[in-house]
């Protein structure tokens, strides 16, 4: 529904939207001799929840799923013309909502002098910090993939960029809003009340067909990397009040957000900051995350590098009127290991500590290639000392270990 209780104008079903965009992207470019590259991976994931579920209906034990993520890329005219088509699919044996298909990218991109043009579906990343990307607002989070908000849905867009000595300027027209997916009734990592996507409310008479706009200026100034961004459109975060039927109903507010990302590089230090100011969720508010990464290179005369990370979070939103967040007053600490060996072995460990109630979130991520075509990945996430008032309280029994075996081609 829209905010004025009128039936929403729904954007076409996701698969149809993606198909039409991909068809347009491929058919809009004449046949030009160039380079075609086909790559990607298939994988099997085993996700184990060691604790019994907190809510009725949730599965327990192991979730087995299969991932298919091919990439089709075409380049011509020395790379000035590019076409990409990257679909993604997951088939889950335990949660029907986690079985899903998406087109991550399907676009035509053309460079003409200092200008770049892109039409289609794409993923755009903004940000510099490790533990949270406040300014990264173009794409919707694929929340059923993982809890770290790193996985993103493809976003239909028109992107025009200009590269000059004084920096880069990008403008985005974003037609068609992507709603955030949520776990189903049998799934883990959900609230007690399941989410009713069919009743989603949009603060726009156009419903999820609202056209959003965004822009970003970025530049290198000495040892500084600077990014300034502006976004106006439907929030990628949803408020989740309980509806008349006892289920949570997503509310997507119309917001305006200004963002700043900074990175300062000096010797072994990386100093990082992301900050936003947003209006549209009740009172305007600001939020920031900032910290550092210090790297010890070639530890003990080996090829390995070790990085130490620390970041402080603050978020001034009023959660009575804004989407909930667990990063209101938190400290992140972590360490990164890169062996720099032929198998590209690396690991990241970290914790996020709530400085107000003591809730601790721990994680470990590691990966290593096996030969030329295989890779094994491990991920573990644990909640410790969870306060019942914390936003993460519904997930207190959802600590998990995920193992992936992937074959690349």
Residue map of PLM features:
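Transmembrane beta-strand segments that form the barrel wall of outer-membrane beta-barrel proteins
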Residues: 44-52, 82-93, 104, 141, ...
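Membrane-embedded beta-strand positions of outer-membrane beta-barrel proteins
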Residues: 40-42, 83-85, 119, 160, ...
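Outer membrane beta-barrel
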Residues: 72-189, 222, 385
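Outer-membrane beta-barrel "beta-signal"
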Residues: 292, 395-409
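Repeated loop/turn-to-beta-strand initiation elements of outer-membrane beta-barrel proteins
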Residues: 36, 78-83, 115-117, 166-169, ...
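Residues that define the transmembrane beta-barrel architecture of outer-membrane proteins
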Residues: 58-66, 99-104, 152-156, 163, ...
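Residue-level signature of outer-membrane beta-barrel architecture
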Residues: 36, 72-76, 109-112, 121, ...
């Amino acid at each position: 529904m829209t905010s004025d209780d009128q039936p929403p104008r729904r954007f076409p079903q996701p698969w149809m939207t993606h198909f039409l965009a991909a068809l347009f992207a491929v058919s809009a470019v004449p046949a030009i001799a160039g380079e075609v590259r086909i790559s990607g991976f298939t994988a099997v994931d085993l996700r184990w929840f060691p604790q019994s579920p907190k809510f009725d209906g949730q599965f327990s034990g192991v979730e087995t799923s299969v991932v298919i993520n091919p990439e089709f890329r075409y380049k011509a005219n020395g790379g000035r013309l590019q076409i990409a088509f990257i679909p993604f699919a997951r088939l889950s044996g335990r949660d029907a909502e986690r079985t899903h298909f998406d087109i991550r990218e399907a676009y035509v991109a053309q460079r003409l002098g200092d200008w770049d043009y892109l039409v289609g579906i794409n993923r755009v990343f903004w940000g510099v910090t490790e533990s949270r990307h406040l300014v990264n607002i173009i794409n919707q989070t694929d929340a059923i993939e993982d809890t770290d908000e790193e996985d993103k849905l493809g976003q239909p867009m028109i992107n025009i960029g200009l590269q000059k000595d004084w920096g880069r300027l990008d403008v985005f027209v974003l037609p068609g809003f992507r709603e955030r997916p949520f776990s189903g009734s049998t799934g883990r990592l959900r609230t007690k009340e399941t989410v009713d996507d069919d009743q989603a409310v949009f603060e726009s008479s156009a419903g999820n067909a609202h056209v959003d706009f965004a822009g970003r200026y970025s530049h290198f100034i000495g040892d500084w990397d600077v990014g300034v961004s502006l976004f106006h459109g439907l929030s990628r975060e949803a408020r989740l009040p309980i509806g008349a039927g006892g289920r949570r109903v997503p509310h997507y507010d119309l917001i305006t957000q200004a963002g700043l990302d900074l990175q300062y590089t000096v010797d072994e230090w990386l100093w990082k900051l992301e900050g936003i100011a947003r209006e549209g969720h009740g009172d305007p508010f600001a939020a920031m995350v900032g910290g550092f990464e210090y790297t010890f290179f070639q530890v003990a005369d080996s090829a390995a590098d070790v990085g130490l990370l620390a970041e402080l979070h603050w978020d001034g939103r009023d959660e009575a009127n804004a989407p909930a967040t667990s990063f209101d007053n938190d400290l992140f600490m972590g360490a990164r290991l890169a062996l720099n060996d032929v198998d590209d072995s690396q690991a990241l460990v970290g914790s996020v500590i709530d400085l107000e109630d003591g809730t601790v979130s721990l994680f470990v991520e590691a990966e290593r290639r096996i030969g030329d075509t295989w890779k094994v990945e491990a991920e573990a996430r644990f909640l410790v000392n969870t306060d019942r008032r914390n936003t993460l309280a519904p997930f207190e029994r959802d600590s998990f270990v995920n193992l992936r075996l992937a074959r690349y081609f």
